[in-house]
């Protein structure tokens, strides 16, 4: 049964990786990163359940707290970027790109 949870977590993680690599919408990329964090939490919870140790569950709670803080900060940043650029496409965020290549 634990193999099923590990398999689900790996599938979720790789769906998140594909979302980060293939998508151009900054909100979709943000949600893919959150999916990867949840997959990591599921792996820790699975191994904590297998070893009957509470350390993994503490790490899961820490991951959930970090994900909540990241979600609030990330969504606020996304809203500000949308207000400034009127788009969530990552191709238009190129202010740091070196334009003068000599």
Swiss-Prot record:
Family: Belongs to the complex I subunit 4L family.
Gene Ontology, cellular component aspect: NADH dehydrogenase complex; plasma membrane
A molecular-function term among this protein's GO annotations: NADH:ubiquinone reductase (non-electrogenic) activity
Enzyme Commission number(s) from the entry: 7.1.1.-
Record's keyword terms, sorted: Cell inner membrane, Cell membrane, Membrane, NAD, Quinone, Translocase, Transmembrane, Transmembrane helix, Transport, Ubiquinone
Enzyme class: translocase
Transmembrane segments: 2-22, 26-46, 58-78
Gene Ontology biological-process entries: ATP synthesis coupled electron transport
Subunit note: NDH-1 is composed of 14 different subunits. Subunits NuoA, H, J, K, L, M, N constitute the membrane sector of the complex.
Compartments, as annotated in UniProt: Cell inner membrane
Gene3D superfamilies: 1.10.287.3510
A Pfam family reported for this protein in Swiss-Prot or TrEMBL: Oxidored_q2
InterPro entries xrefs: NADH_UbQ_OxRdtase_chain4L/K, NUOK/Mnh_C1-like
Reaction equation(s) it catalyzes: a quinone + NADH + 5 H(+)(in) = a quinol + NAD(+) + 4 H(+)(out)
Name under which the protein is recorded: NADH-quinone oxidoreductase subunit K
Role: NDH-1 shuttles electrons from NADH, via FMN and iron-sulfur (Fe-S) centers, to quinones in the respiratory chain. The immediate electron acceptor for the enzyme in this species is believed to be ubiquinone. Couples the redox reaction to proton translocation (for every two electrons transferred, four hydrogen ions are translocated across the cytoplasmic membrane), and thus conserves the redox energy in a proton gradient.
Membrane topology: Multi-pass membrane protein
Main location: membrane
């Amino acid at each position: 049964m634990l193999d099923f949870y590990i398999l689900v977590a790996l599938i979720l993680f790789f769906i998140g990786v594909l979302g980060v690599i293939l998508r151009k919408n900054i909100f979709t990329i943000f949600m893919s990163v959150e999916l990867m964090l949840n997959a990591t939490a599921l792996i820790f919870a699975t191994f904590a359940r297998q070893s009957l140790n509470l350390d993994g569950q503490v790490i899961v709670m820490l991951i959930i707290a970090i994900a909540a803080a990241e979600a609030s900060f990330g969504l606020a940043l996304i809203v500000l970027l949308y207000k400034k650029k009127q788009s969530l496409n990552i191709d238009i965020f190129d202010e740091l790109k070196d334009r003068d290549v000599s």
